[in-house]
UniProtKB/Swiss-Prot annotation:
Tissue specificity note: Expressed in normal fibroblasts and those from LPI patients. Also expressed in HUVECs, monocytes, RPE cells, and various carcinoma cell lines. Expressed in brain, heart, testis, kidney, small intestine and parotis. Highly expressed in T lymphocytes.
Gene name of the encoded protein: SLC7A6
Residue numbers on the Cytoplasmic membrane side: 1-44, 100-114, 189-194, 257-266, 333-363, 407-425, 473-515
Protein name, entry field: Y+L amino acid transporter 2
Keywords recorded for this protein, A-Z: Amino-acid transport, Antiport, Cell membrane, Disulfide bond, Membrane, Phosphoprotein, Transmembrane, Transmembrane helix, Transport
Length: 515
């Protein structure tokens, strides 16, 4: 890992084919050919692809499986729906703040890139470290396991599916989607589009069925909707936390900003389209659940959508477990697509080994970063209680998201003349920062042990930053340098990859912004 000096060009490697003398003479006599393409990730994500990425990553298995996380802390349907609406509104505010950040700092990497721009390399590295070590691989392992469970469970109706079979199918799912994203960016976006449509159609079917029941007069569950509501601030805080976890993923498109066509237009537009869609779907889906199921049914169900389907879909109830699996598959694809770009950008900034910022010379996909992401997720499949690990990063997740928006306010003050294609009222980032402080403090009191473990995981990156980034390369252990050089060379040959070139136009634009 090498920290590059500001202004120093990124080293580039070019594959030069062997040519015979006759070939050279033939080339001289032939018409001049177009110069080779610049070795960079290509802008292949359209507005529709962007909407699919955001919606597909936000709508995971949670809305199908465990909306009871909000209900258990609110104790009433009325208060539960209010919390879902507040969670959606808060997520919309955060997404709008990220839309401004994404059009102002046109780099991939989401909060990592924004923290790097505002506060420098150390805090950005810690943010990258937490994602690399826990957040991304744990989340992907859990999604893959959930997918495998819903695929295998119908074959074992009276017992739990075999542990090893679930883990092997989860591993196959991760490897398949990694291959798809290594092959072509378009393959990844087409998979995303298809599975996003599938999960939205499944949720619309649930919503329509619920509204039909409601129109038929089944409104008894809403007659005293707020009866028994919990007004305890601690419980309401935990309910909001559960809702916000289901809304997570609204920053997906910010991880791939550099690959979006016309990002200054399409990034905020995709966010503006996606957020109302997801918020409306979540609220209406819960209304459908609450129309058919009473509170005890919801709280006792391991998969609320499946229980709902058993009571309403009749012979077609089998479609909902399939829909949950498809939703997980699409969500996993979006996560792999986004997190690989995070590692790619981290490598390009000198915070990870150079080999992770290589791309295939013909397909223009970050194959080493994708393979690294795949390896980390597969390692976490070995951990038997991988679901426990998700409790460690709720504190750090909201800390870094909030810090990104603090950076937005800081850059407003530090660089007031910097061009901002989208400039929000300062009211939005201030409100989001205040709410983020609340979301950071709550786990420290309600889940102290797990929060402290999360802080410890973040701080474990400090010695790695010192050894791999802060320390000059000449002072790092020779053995480590030789090993990294050998791995980099082998990866380049095996994956047919080279380091990306600096985008001169983008660099000049960034210089004009900071002048």
């Amino acid at each position: 890992m090498e920290a590059r000096e500001p202004g120093r060009p990124t080293p580039t490697y070019h594959l030069v084919p062997n040519t015979s003398q006759s070939q050279v003479e033939e080339d001289v006599s032939s018409p001049p050919q177009r110069s080779s393409e610049t070795m960079q990730l290509k802008k292949e994500i359209s507005l529709l692809n962007g909407v699919s990425l955001v919606v597909g990553n936000m709508i995971g298995s949670g809305i199908f499986v465990s909306p009871k996380g909000v209900l258990v802390h609110t104790a009433s349907y009325g208060m539960s729906l209010i919390v879902w609406a507040i969670g959606g509104l808060f997520s919309v505010v955060g997404a709008l703040c990220y839309a401004e950040l994404g059009t102002t700092i046109t780099k991939s990497g989401a909060s990592y890139a924004y923290i790097l721009e505002a506060f420098g390399g150390f805090i950005a590295f810690i943010r990258l470290w937490v994602s690399l070590l826990v957040v991304e691989p744990t989340g992907q392992a859990i999604i893959a396991i959930t997918f495998a469970n819903y695929i295998i469970q119908p074959s074992f109706p009276s017992c739990d599916p075999p542990y090893l079979a679930c883990r092997l199918l989860a591993a196959a799912c991760i490897c398949l989607l990694t291959f798809v994203n290594c092959a072509y960016v378009k393959w990844g976006t087409r998979v995303q589009d298809t599975f996003t449509y599938a999960k939205v159609v499944a949720l619309i079917a649930i919503i329509v069925m619920g509204l039909v029941k409601l129109c038929q007069g089944h409104s008894e569950h809403f007659q005293d909707a707020f009866e028994g509501s919990s007004w305890d601030m601690g419980n309401l805080s935990l309910a909001l936390y559960s809702a916000l976890f289901s809304y997570s993923g609204w920053d997906t498109l910010n991880f791939v900003t550099e690959e979006i066509k016309n990002p200054e237009r399409n990034l905020p537009l995709a966010i503006g389209i996606s957020m109302p869609i997801v918020t409306l779907i979540y609220i209406l889906t819960n209304v459908a659940y609450y129309t058919v199921l009473n509170i005890s049914d919801v709280l006792s169900s391991d998969a609320v959508a499946v229980t709902f389907a058993d009571q309403t879909f009749g012979m077609f109830s089998w479609t909902i477990p399939i829909a949950v699996a498809l939703s997980c598959f699409g969500g996993l694809n979006a996560s792999i697509f986004a997190s690989s770009r995070l590692f790619f950008v981290g490598s390009r900034e000198g915070h990870l080994p150079d080999l992770l910022s290589m791309i295939h010379i013909e397909r223009f996909t970050p194959i080493p970063a994708l393979l690294f992401n795949c390896t980390m997720a597969l390692i976490y499949l070995i951990v038997e209680d991988v679901f426990q690990l998700i409790n460690y990063f709720s504190f750090s997740y909201w800390f870094f998201v909030g810090l990104s928006v603090v950076g937005q306010l800081y850059l407003r003050w530090k660089e007031p003349k910097r061009p901002r294609p989208l400039k929000l009222s300062v009211f939005f980032p201030i409100v989001f920062c205040i709410c983020s402080v609340f979301l950071v403090i709550v786990p420290l009191f309600t889940d102290t042990i797990n929060s402290l473990i999360g802080i410890g995981i973040a701080l474990s990156g400090v010695p790695f930053y010192f050894m791999g980034v802060y320390l000059p390369e000449s002072r790092r252990p020779l053995f480590i340098r030789n090993v990294l050089a050998a791995i980099t060379r082998g990866t380049q040959q095996l994956c047919f990859c080279v380091l990306t070139e600096l985008d001169v136009a983008e660099e000049k634009k960034d210089e004009r912004k900071t002048d």
